[in-house]
Design a protein with these regions (language model features):
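Class I S-adenosyl-L-methionine
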Residues: 1-13, 18-20, 25-122, 212, ...
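A contiguous loop/helix-start segment that scaffolds small-molecule binding in enzyme catalytic cores
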Residues: 3, 166-240
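Solvent-exposed alpha-helices and their adjacent loops that cap or buttress functional pockets
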Residues: 22-23, 87, 95, 142-146, ...
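General beta-strand structural signal in soluble alpha/beta enzymes
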Residues: 32, 60, 95-97, 125-128, ...
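Short gly/pro/ser/thr-enriched loop/turn and capping motifs at secondary-structure boundaries
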Residues: 37-40, 130-133, 181-182, 207-209
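Short, surface-exposed amphipathic charged segments that create phosphate/polyanion-binding patches used
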Residues: 71-80, 139-141, 165-168, 212-220
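A polyampholytic, Gly/Pro-enriched intrinsically disordered region
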Residues: 76-85, 142-154, 218-232
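Class I SAM-dependent methyltransferase SAM-binding "motif I" and its flanking Rossmann-like core
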Residues: 102-168
């Protein structure tokens, strides 16, 4: 009994690995995450061109965007049981996730439940291209060089944690949340980034709607997020 978890990358279907495409094409059942009932799955939209929908069943699993850990754990158990029940029928099963399964992924919650309750299932994890690697390629930039350090901030609401990370790293990757853009820019100034430090901001990396802008830090002070209210990724380099 085998389950393949596939990292679908940032958005461009052509960035899926050869192994990922092979598993998707052979799948009898595909599971894909979404935040609420009726909302399209991003991971599914990336992989759809490789799915034979006439022979493959597709199940959307709900991962609500809430902070109540108890409620979340209940949903994780439900989702993992749905997957396990199907795997135990002997079908070729695939779980899709955006980016890479090891990085801020819904897969990690499923994986923990399966290891604890269904350790008879053989799990295969196929890596995907993280959004910030696709971002760096599109921007034709280096994230870090030599002995430089790199920090990743998954969301920007904990400003103290951001301050600690920024103070100790040469390059910072900010993911997902642009509501605190002004505060983040000020923290960069406070923690050693110069007026000429390079800031690159992107939305919708690797798809047709992609927006990518590079500016000096001094040009972003007292301005709104140049890529809009929400940014997918912002990279700040201290020394360029």
């Amino acid at each position: 009994m085998k389950l393949s978890c596939i990292g679908c990358g940032p958005g461009d279907p052509d960035l899926l690995t050869v192994k990922a495409v092979d598993r998707i094409k052979k799948a009898d059942a595909i599971f894909t995450p979404t935040s609420k009932e009726g909302k399209p799955s991003i991971a599914l939209s990336i992989a759809r061109k490789y799915i034979n929908e006439s022979t493959t069943t597709i199940t959307n699993l709900i991962f609500p965007m809430i902070k109540d850990k108890d409620s979340l754990k209940v949903q994780w158990k439900i989702n993992s049981q749905i997957i396990a029940d199907t795997v135990h029928t002997g079908k070729n099963c695939v779980y899709l996730t955006v980016g890479d399964p090891s990085l801020y992924s819904t897969w990690n919650y499923i994986h923990k439940e399966l290891k604890e309750k269904h350790d008879d299932i053989d799990i295969e994890i196929i890596p995907g291209v993280p959004s910030f690697f696709a971002f760096a390629a599109q921007a034709k930039m280096s994230l870090v060089e030599g002995d430089q350090t790199l920090g990743i901030v998954p969301a920007c609401y904990d400003l103290d944690k951001i301050r600690q990370t920024v103070a100790s790293c040469d390059s910072i990757i900010f993911l997902k949340d642009g509501r605190y853009f002004d505060s983040v820019i000020e923290i960069l100034f406070e923690t050693g980034f110069s007026d000429n430090s390079v800031i690159t901001i992107a939305q919708d990396v690797s798809v047709d709607e992609e927006i990518l802008e590079t500016k000096k830090l001094k040009d972003l002070r007292n301005t709104k997020n140049p890529a809009g209210k929400y940014f997918s990724i912002m990279v700040a380099r201290k020394n360029d």
